[in-house]
Amino acid sequence: MSNNLQDILAAASGYQSVTSEPALNRKRPKTLDDYPVIPPASKKVSVISSDLTLHIGFDTEYVFNPETRQNDILSYQSYVVLPDNTGISNIIYPPDSQKKSRLSFKDFLCQTITPLLETGVITKWPGIINIYAHFIRADIASFANFWSDYKILLKGIRGTVSSFKNRYGIDFDEQQERRVKTEQIMFDKRTSPPRCSNVAFIDTLLITPGGMGLAECGELLGLPKLTIPAPYSITNMREYLLGDRAGFEAYALRDAEIAVRYALQVRNFCARELMIDRVPATIGAMAVSRFTKTLKENNMSPEVCLGTHIKTRELWLTEKQAFRTIKNPASVPSRELFETFPINCYHGGRNECFMMGVTPSDHWYDYDLAGAYTTGLLDILTPDYGNIRLSKNPDDYCGHVMGFALVTFRFPESVPYPSLPVRTDQYGLFFPLSGESWATAPEIELALSLGAEMTIHNGIIVPWICDTSPHNSESTSVFLPFVQQVRENRNRHIKGSLEEKFWKEIGNSLYGKLAQGLRAKTAFDTARGLNRSLPPSSVTQPFFAAHVTGFIRAVVGELMNALPSDSSVVSVTTDGFLTNCPLDKINMSGPLSSRFQSLCDIVDPGSSMLTCKHEVSQLIAMKTRGQLTYKAIQGKPVVHARAGVKPPADIPRSDYNDYMVDLYLNRLPGQTLSRSTLISTREMWLSESDLVSREQDIRLNLEFDFKRQPVRPAMNEGHLLMFSRPWDNMEEALQQRSLFDDWRQTHTLKTLADWDDWCDFLYCRTVFSDMKLKVGSKRSDDILVRLFLRALTQCQWGLMLKDKKSYSCKEVAEWLTSEGYSVTVTDVKNAVRAKIPQMKFSSVTPRMKSLMDIIARKYPTFCLPV
């Protein structure tokens, strides 16, 4: 564009042109916007070659090259399943390991399918190609065009690779409820008709119950994953290829076969059991699909139950010169108006550790609520969103009520486990004796029953359309048809079978979809290379999610507070707790527990609301989600929660507990663990890298997390043991947690000496720091020495002029130095000018007491102000 033309345009728009000729000619750096996510629509749409569908499992074998920091590709293998269920395998070797010799994805498919045509196995080019791999992110980057061909990468893969979500950090939520996206690929225009196929990518890892590995999938199919014989190993597949080519090929091809056979089994499951003709991107999406179908099958409107309505808008399509109607669900105004309340009350599970160290020997039971969240969903009837009302009356929140409120509270000191959550940005939930909480109705009811004083500042009550208990009016329970169907189908299949595992996972997954997007989480968007917030799912419902989590927290809290006084609780984790109280002595007659039991009876008549998962005779309590077995009970499963620590690869799983026990008991200040982690998808995208691992040192963090105040320190089995009490308030809790984070940088809490050192550190920073005294790395007796010198030279704190004159500055300095304190003559002389703070000592540390005894021998009248 010339300057004149630019000036004309600028003038027409009302803006002054400021772009110079050199700037116009200068080459502009490219940005992400120069690489379109979806290519411009072609005016001519190619027609796919045929109605033939091929299902292809694929896998790659590679070795990491430390020089290039990339992978050397050894082979590409495929396993094609024909319409008659016949399987045909193929393996392709690149000419060498250089990156330029890699196959493009299109070439891979051509070399896989063309031989089938040439040999007459198929008679026409497939119009639909479904590609399956287990953890597709590891293999898809092995193709030459992974980064350069945006058409295949960012559109074709987005519906599947983007489905890595929670496990791998890519956002897929907006795609999760849609059909798997396909990308039309033209393989050869010269043929007649042209070879054109719709290609879809499916990651089988995302459709496995519990994120099973390929070996577990193979076991369910009766198609075991092959093992690599010694002396070969997975870390150097090149040696395996060179030493045993036949074994290498069998191993590699089996992985591709398992992926596609497993996916087809899931496809059959979806058609037969879920009555859907497609495979959703994840099991969570299956749960959503099944839930909405059960509502309709039972004449229940999803819109009425969820408080949504369909919003339509018209979108003008330029290329078609026509309007397109877009329909999206949206909250009804009455729900949208009050959504802030349940969103603020949605906290997740209660997770606390009540002891630290090696517990006393006893019989410890690990109890879980039976199907906690799935059962808890039955507590929800159909809400009457149009009649939501405000209430500040605590009594309105008692009984079978859906309500949410902002409250201030104080529990009696005698309550061992306060029940109102206080959320912190950095440390999760705390349950102090007093504070401010966003609480659900069940939690408010429990708090009142425990004697809490409470003021409701703002709150809402959401009435039920049919205001009766769910067990008296089962048809009004929103989730009853879904939960019953899950239970019936699980019972129909053999325990441990693929079908039974799928139904169990479907039942457990629905709750997570209700809560999706309620808390700010970011994920990497492969389409733009940027992080963005995860959107809600199609059934995200803050009222339901908050009520269920609050109900479960309240039930667990009621059970723990009803335990006999001689019972102890080691920890609580979401829906269960570790205690030394046998099942027959647990009081389950409270109103909330009784309500939960009645829901259990609906799902499984005669069942108990509590199930015992583990039993041990002695535990190690480290922190939240960190409990180990110190002494097992013969024939009983052990407790083993590692607090996020991943043992080294050479440690067998059966030895994990022993490894963790040794690691905890012998941990050192500042200790790090070497950990191999896969690079993130974001890093793969930005650096155009293969999926490679990175070794990094992770700081060991097994110290107590101070969600409770530690008390009663003692030594047990050679390690410090502490019990705990609830914090009085959040200011005290956060102050001590912050100070402990500082102290543990160079210390561990393993002995009574460590405990004394921590207490001294805490004393200095809570007592002396408030007096504007410079603490630094000093301990309490170091600071008291300085205060004593000031009192001595200024005749304060019980000291008089005769005491000051009893010894020279040099004699005082030498005396204190001989007692282990570094004091110079100058320190003594300068003390006369230093200010003595106005303070009173309500307590002293052991270090201070020892120093006071030393001082008393020379200055018996010296005393601290109280």
UniProtKB/Swiss-Prot annotation:
Result after altering H614A: Normal primer synthesis and polymerase activity
Stretches the record annotates as Fingers domain: 482-522
GO molecular function annotation: DNA binding; DNA-directed DNA polymerase activity; exonuclease activity
Region (Exonuclease domain) residue spans: 50-286
Region (TPR2 domain): 523-549
InterPro entries: DNA/RNA_pol_sf (IPR043502)
One example of a Gene Ontology biological process annotation: DNA replication
Cofactor (UniProt): Mn(2+)
EC id: 2.7.7.-, 3.1.11.-, 2.7.7.7
Region (Thumb domain): 679-866
Cofactor binding remark: Translesion synthesis across abasic sites is more efficient with Mn(2+) compared to Mg(2+), replication of undamaged template is more efficient with Mg(2+).
Keywords: DNA damage, DNA repair, DNA replication, DNA-binding, DNA-directed DNA polymerase, Exonuclease, Hydrolase, Magnesium, Manganese, Nuclease, Nucleotidyltransferase, Transferase
Region (Palm2 domain): 550-678
Region of interest called Palm1 domain, as start-end residue ranges on this chain: 287-385
Chain positions covered by the region annotation TPR1 domain: 386-481
Catalysed transformations (reactions): DNA(n) + a 2'-deoxyribonucleoside 5'-triphosphate = DNA(n+1) + diphosphate
Primary role: DNA polymerase with primer-independent templated DNA polymerization activity, primer-dependent DNA polymerization activity with strand displacement, translesion synthesis activity across non-bulky base damage, 3'-5' exodeoxyribonuclease activity, and de novo primer synthesis activity. The enzyme is processive and faithful. Translation synthesis across abasic sites is coupled to de novo primer synthesis. Overexpression of wild-type protein increases survival of cells upon mitomycin C or UV treatment.
Any further remark recorded for this protein: Encoded in a mobile genetic element called pipolin.
Protein name per Swiss-Prot or TrEMBL: Primer-independent DNA polymerase PolB
